[in-house]
From Swiss-Prot:
It holds the Pfam family Amidohydro_1. The keyword Zinc applies. The keyword Metal-binding applies. Homotetramer. It comes from the Archaea. This is 5'-deoxyadenosine deaminase. InterPro entries: Amidohydro-rel (IPR006680), Deaminase_MtaD/DadD (IPR023512), Metal-dep_hydrolase_composite (IPR011059), Metal_Hydrolase (IPR032466), MTA/SAH_deaminase (IPR050287). It comes from Methanothrix thermoacetophila (strain DSM 6194 / JCM 14653 / NBRC 101360 / PT). Binds 1 zinc ion per subunit. Its cofactor is Zn(2+). GO terms for molecular function: 5'-deoxyadenosine deaminase activity; 5'-methylthioadenosine deaminase activity; adenosine deaminase activity; metal ion binding; S-adenosylhomocysteine deaminase activity. Its EC number is 3.5.4.41, 3.5.4.31, 3.5.4.4, 3.5.4.28. Zn(2+) binds at residues 57, 59, 198, 286. Substrate binds at residues 86, 171, 201, 286.
Length: 413
């Protein structure tokens, strides 16, 4: 496949008339006047080629619950609405929700997502069918102790797949015992996979934990020896200065989800301070049930402007830093060999620059973070075109099936 005459961003500058040659699932060459290797040629004039974006924390099947429970705080939202409905979920519902979520990710140029949920075999199969990458972990709760027995078989089944990266997903310190957390850590270390956990998301959660344990959730995990560079900790909203130092010292990756945190009134994560201390911060949307979309570009803008306002300095978290959160920082967190360069995985999106929000052509990174509206034109993952000129094959069928599943779930209330 040859992508011809695209524009790319290199060291902050816009380079035009660049060809990108793809062989198999890798980029084999980036340059000018490249010769095609087959009949597949994409005319990318007036298009910006960007590397595949990463959604670093979500619950993709919960796209099926978009708009079901709004305007509530986290714990009542979970206990009164989400968990009762989730108890009625069937594997087919999760499959439909995942495929619906994948449609949305593909439209926004996302080629990899990090997920924690139920029915992970169905999630993995649906993700693979849709053609994108998933870092997938079955959620672990003490209220469902049998779930941990599924972790190793899932890892063994999927660890050699080229799109699926199995991981271990203890839900949070308030839903997992010390034994569960240590078992999760042991499994992750033995199989060399990532750990995905919610951490210090709400003030009530942290205050309750401190009152019970006389230490913060971060200090507790540190005392257990749980924290390391394999951990991706979602949210990290309520942190002490000591917590931040611990996360930095242990090279923990943080998945920042600003819109969900704002909508659930959970708070504003100290992202600028985390970055100043050297913490690798990525970007996620959380689930569409609490966001309510999977628009990673919207997430970038909100992440930037909220930090500027909360810190009181407009220079905090500039556009290029936010862009890295959705790309390079996530590649590091999930060990992804991605980027628009020779030898990288062929994951990229083509975005039409002939749109009002990209004119005048000044800083394209600024436009992507602060101005971007709409969707990509092409999304390519692992060398396969998933969306061509705004069209995704089979989209109508996926939408109809998701609607049917939702209506059945609601009818059983």
């Amino acid at each position: 496949m040859l992508i011809r005459s695209a524009s790319i961003i290199r060291n902050g500058s816009l380079l035009k008339n660049i060809d990108i040659l793809i062989e198999g699932n890798r980029i084999s060459e980036v340059g000018r006047d490249l010769r095609p290797n087959d009949d597949e040629i994409i005319d990318a004039r007036n298009m910006l080629a960007v590397p595949g974006l990463v959604n670093s924390h979500t619950h993709l099947a919960m796209t099926l619950l978009r708009g079901y429970a709004d305007d509530m705080e986290l714990i009542p939202w979970l206990q009164e609405k989400i968990w009762p409905l989730e108890a009625r979920l069937k594997p087919s519902d999760v499959r439909a929700g995942v495929k619906l979520g994948c449609l949305e990710l593909i439209r926004f140029g996302v080629t990899c997502y990090n997920d924690m949920y139920y029915f992970m075999d169905e999630t993995a199969a649906a993700t693979r069918e849709m053609g994108i990458r998933g870092v997938l972990s079955g959620v672990l709760f003490d209220m469902r102790p049998e779930f941990i027995n599924d972790v190793e078989p899932f890892i063994k089944k999927w660890r050699d797949d080229d799109l699926i990266k199995p991981a271990v997903g203890p839900h949070a310190v308030y839903t997992c015992s010390e034994e569960t957390l240590l078992r999760a850590k042991d499994i992750a270390e033995r199989y060399d996979v990532k750990i995905h956990i919610h951490l210090s998301e709400t003030r009530d959660e942290v205050d309750t934990f401190v009152n019970q344990r006389h230490m913060s959730p971060v200090e507790y995990l540190e005392n257990l020896g749980f924290l390391s560079e394999r951990v991706v900790a979602a949210h990290c909203v309520w942190l002490t200065p000591r917590d931040i130092r611990i996360l930095a010292e242990r090279h923990v990756n943080v998945a920042h989800c600003p819109i969900s945190n704002l909508k659930l009134a959970s708070g504003i994560a100290p992202v600028a301070t985390l970055i100043e201390h050297g913490v690798n911060v990525c970007l996620g949307t959380d689930g569409a049930s609490s966001n309510n979309n999977l628009d990673i570009f919207e997430e970038m803008k909100v992440a930037a402007v909220v930090q500027k306002c909360s810190v009181g300095r407009s220079a905090i978290l500039p556009a290029d830093a936010v862009w890295r959160m959705a790309t390079e920082n996530a590649y590091k967190a999930f060990s992804l060999d991605m980027g628009i360069r020779r030898g990288a995985l062929a994951d990229l999106a083509l975005i039409n620059m002939r749109r009002p929000w990209f004119i005048p052509v000044t800083s394209m990174i600024s436009h992507l973070v602060y101005s971007m509206s709409g969707e990509a034109s092409y999304t390519i993952c692992n060398g396969r075109v998933l969306m061509r000129d705004g069209v995704i094959e089979g989209e109508a069928k996926i939408l109809d099936e998701a609607q049917r599943c939702y209506e059945r779930l609601i009818s059983e209330e």
